[in-house]
């Protein structure tokens, strides 16, 4: 029994004279029963001890419905043959009719005997199909509980029934059985094609692309501003060279003052002087220096463009991470897990109180639920406090670990429709374990 790994707890309440199937068809997982306990409250006044019985049907026989259908077909064919024979006998002489009637009666007697043999054998087969076993007898006055060790697989058709005055409760575990893994091989092959569990580039890169784009836009704007300023400066110099130089001797003191004012004003605009030749020489030297300074950024422009060329190199590791395949595993019920990051410390198991962060998505990528901030979602693992796929998917994680869990409808909400969640939805959860107690 060492290969049977517990997954979650199993409980079944049995009322007297009410047969219950051991394994639910919607949750076909192997169970291991370890305890049977009696409820001290009787359902009648007889106060008779309760006997737990196991009813097991064998699948080695042919279905009764198929056998009945075959018998009906045979009887119909024989009836048609008899009708045709009777029509032919009416045309023949009376003496022949008498002989034929005797033959028909003999044939009918033989057929009746065969039918009786078939019916008797079918009843015997029905009795042989179902086997009844007594597991234990419990009573509040004598024995409250009994330890047992029964393992039942989904392939077995097993029912429990209680005879007596007291209800009986069964306790055990859902377990991982080697036979269950063999039955899930076909699903493993399909799941690799159906689910694209590799993260998108947007999920890995995040907002870094937007930051780089912003920097590129800023550098482009600065370069354009510098080019516009240089064009304006060159255009003003051409206009100044074409204008005739006015004689300084004819200018009045007021004109000189105005020239000085205009020169000071035009220096701020970097357009060069509009007055005397002395100021022109100074401004030409300054213009050359400024032009040299402005030409320097042009030489450095290839350096600014280098990050653009190197950017794909930086993104290559991220693209490699996006295309990297993470280890996947298919659990019972078709739940698929993909470990993105391995945590440290003890691993979560049935009975632990775990806290998680998660993002829940539908198959089309739409987010229907999430817990990314505030108080983490805390629940008891394996106690049925959440959907079955969560109990299976979180088991085995360590604190700091990240895992993607794909849950089929039967292990999620099934045919139940919720706001924003259609019925029979396949769910994908990105989970991070933050605490174990």
Curated annotation (Swiss-Prot):
Catalytic activity: [protein]-peptidylproline (omega=180) = [protein]-peptidylproline (omega=0)
Annotated Gene Ontology cellular component terms: chromatin; nucleolus
Protein's UniProt keywords contain Nucleus: yes
Region described as Disordered: 73-132, 169-349
Activity regulation description: Inhibited by both FK506 and rapamycin.
UniProt biased composition (Basic and acidic residues): 256-270, 292-324
Entry's Gene Ontology molecular function annotations: peptidyl-prolyl cis-trans isomerase activity
Keywords carried by this UniProt record: Isomerase, Nucleus, Rotamase
Keyword Isomerase assigned: yes
Acidic residues: bias regions: 73-90, 106-131, 179-220
Record SUPFAM superfamilies: FKBP-like
Cell compartment(s), UniProt: Nucleus, Nucleolus
Domain PPIase FKBP-type: 351-437
EC code: 5.2.1.8
Annotated function: PPIases accelerate the folding of proteins. It catalyzes the cis-trans isomerization of proline imidic peptide bonds in oligopeptides.
Similarity annotation: Belongs to the FKBP-type PPIase family. FKBP3/4 subfamily.
Name listed for the protein in its UniProt record: FK506-binding protein 3
Originating organism: Debaryomyces hansenii (strain ATCC 36239 / CBS 767 / BCRC 21394 / JCM 1990 / NBRC 0083 / IGC 2968)
Source lineage: Eukaryota, Fungi, Dikarya, Ascomycota, Saccharomycotina
Name of the gene this protein is made from: FPR3
